[in-house]
C-alpha cells in the first residue's frame, strides 16, 4: 500500500494535521490541536501519527522559513525539515510559510468555500491572499503554465502606511507594544485587542459618541482599507484578493461600507484600478492543508 503524506498547518494558536492520498487531502484525516497543549511540534506529530509510516511532509508554518527551518512568530516553536524527516521516517520534508500554503490552495478549493464581498471587475492574472488572524501576512499567487508560484513574504511586519486621519494618540499607543509599528500591530487578533484597549481609555474624544465596539471596528476598518488599497497597487491582483483568518471573517460583514471602500479606493488617478479589484472571504479551515498537498504534487517528480 502506498504511504500517505503528512500535511501540516502550524499557526500561532492551533495546528491542523491531515494526510494526503494520491496527491489530495483526505478530509476525514484532519485533526486540530491547540498548540498550548503540546510542548512542541514533535510531540504533536507523534500523537497524531502514532507510528504510522509516511512518504513525505509538507508544512505551512506561521513564520519565515530560512534554509529549511522556521522559528514561529507567535509561539516559541522551532521546526527543521531534516529533523521532521528523521522523526517520522519520511523520505522528504518541506516547510513553507502558512500564507504560501493558502495561496497554493486557490485552484483546488470548492466553490462553496468562498463568498464574494466586492465583485470588482476581475481579469485572469495575479491573485493575492491576505491573512488576518493571530498574525498578518500576504501571499501573491502567480500562474506558471499549469502550476502555481507563490513566493514567501512577511508583509505583516512592514510598517503601517501613513494615515494622518487616524485618531490623535493612537499611533503612540501602538508604538508602546511594537515600536516599529508593523501592519500586524493593528491587523491581527492581538492588534484588535490593542485598539479596543486604547478606545476603552476614553482619550479619543470624537469616538466617545460611539459604542466602544463600533469605534474599534471603524478604526480597524480604516487601517485595513489603507493596507488593502496599497496592496492593490503594489501587486495589481487583477484576479482578486482573498481574505482568510478569524479577524477577516469578523470584519467581512463591514467591508461593503463606505468606511472601508472609500479609503481603499482613494488612489488618485488610479482609483479605477483599485476599484476593479474584487474581494472575497475564504471559509475553509483546511485550505492550508489543501495547499500543502498541491505544493507536494508540484515538486514531486
Language-model features: locations:
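ATP-binding/phosphotransfer module of carbohydrate and carboxylate kinases, centering on a glycine-rich
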Residues: 1-50, 165-301
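Short glycine-aspartate micro-motif
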Residues: 5-9, 54-58, 94, 127-131, ...
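Short acidic-glycine loop/turn motifs at beta-strand connectors
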Residues: 21-24, 68, 142-146
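Active-site nucleophile and cofactor-binding loops and adjacent substrate-binding regions
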Residues: 34-36, 74-75, 94-101, 119-123, ...
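Short beta-strand-loop/turn "lid" adjacent to the catalytic site in phosphate-handling enzymes
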Residues: 50-95, 103-113, 129, 250-253
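Glycine-rich phosphate-binding loop signature in dinucleotide/nucleotide-binding domains
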Residues: 50-53, 89, 121-124, 235-236
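ATP-dependent carbohydrate kinase catalytic cores
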Residues: 93-122, 206-221, 226
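Glycine-rich phosphate-binding loop of actin/hexokinase-like ATP-binding domains
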Residues: 114-119, 123-178, 182, 260-265, ...
Amino acid at each position: 500500500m502506498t504511504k500517505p503524506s503528512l500535511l501540516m498547518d502550524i499557526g500561532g494558536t492551533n495546528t491542523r494535521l491531515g494526510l494526503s492520498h494520491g496527491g489530495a487531502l483526505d478530509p476525514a484525516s484532519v485533526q486540530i490541536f491547540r498548540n498550548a497543549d503540546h510542548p512542541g511540534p514533535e510531540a504533536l506529530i507523534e500523537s497524531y501519527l502514532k507510528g504510522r509510516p509516511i512518504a513525505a511532509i509538507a508544512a505551512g508554518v506561521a513564520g519565515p522559513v530560512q534554509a529549511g527551518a522556521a522559528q514561529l512568530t507567535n509561539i516559541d516553536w522551532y521546526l527543521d525539515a531534516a529533523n521532521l524527516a528523521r522523526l517520522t521516517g519520511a523520505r522528504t520534508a518541506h516547510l513553507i510559510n502558512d500564507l504560501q500554503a493558502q495561496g497554493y490552495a486557490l485552484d483546488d478549493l470548492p466553490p462553496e468555500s468562498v463568498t464574494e464581498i466586492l465583485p470588482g471587475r476581475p481579469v485572469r492574472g495575479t491573485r493575492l491572499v491576505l491573512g488576518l488572524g493571530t498574525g498578518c501576512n500576504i501571499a501573491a499567487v502567480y500562474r506558471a503554465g499549469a502550476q502555481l508560484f507563490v513566493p514567501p513574504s512577511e508583509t505583516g511586519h512592514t510598517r503601517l502606511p501613513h494615515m494622518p486621519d487616524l485618531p490623535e494618540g493612537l499611533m503612540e499607543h501602538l508604538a508602546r507594544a511594537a515600536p516599529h509599528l508593523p501592519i500586524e500591530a493593528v491587523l491581527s487578533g492581538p492588534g484588535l485587542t490593542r485598539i479596543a484597549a486604547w478606545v476603552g481609555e476614553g482619550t479619543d474624544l470624537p469616538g466617545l459618541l460611539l459604542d466602544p465596539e463600533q469605534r474599534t471596528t471603524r478604526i480597524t476598518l480604516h487601517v485595513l482599507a489603507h493596507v488593502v488599497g496599497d496592496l492593490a497597487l503594489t501587486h495589481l491582483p487583477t484576479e482578486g484578493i482573498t481574505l482568510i483568518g478569524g479577524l477577516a471573517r469578523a470584519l467581512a460583514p463591514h467591508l461593503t461600507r463606505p468606511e472601508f471602500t472609500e479609503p481603499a479606493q482613494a488612489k488618485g488617478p488610479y482609483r479605477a484600478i483599485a476599484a476593479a479589484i474584487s474581494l472575497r472571504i475564504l471559509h475553509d479551515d483546511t485550505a492550508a492543508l489543501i495547499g500543502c498537498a498541491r505544493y507536494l504534487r508540484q515538486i514531486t517528480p
